[in-house]
């Protein structure tokens, strides 16, 4: 009657259409990543966090999960923040944790549970203003 708890079939179709990357977009993202990697060598501190997050977002759009995780982890090392990168990283950790649980890989499962705990600590630190 009200549609509570029911998934919108139209939004699923739209999301599937958006996931297809054109060759031009892939090339553009790879160029962006390359330029940002060069740019990051020339700066230090908190500015690096922003650029690493941009690199991570580009890798995420390319569906390169391991590179995405690496870039977002470097971003959080440079500066703790709770932005899009944080949310995507938490989502990827949860996905990796679920895959490890499904494969009965206890070692990987513990690694990703620990990483998720660290992410929760980052959230607390940012909320409290701790650096």
Where are these regions (language model features)?
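Structural marker of alpha-solenoid helical repeat scaffolds
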Residues: 42-44, 78, 126
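Short coil turns that delineate tetratricopeptide repeat
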Residues: 45-46, 80, 121
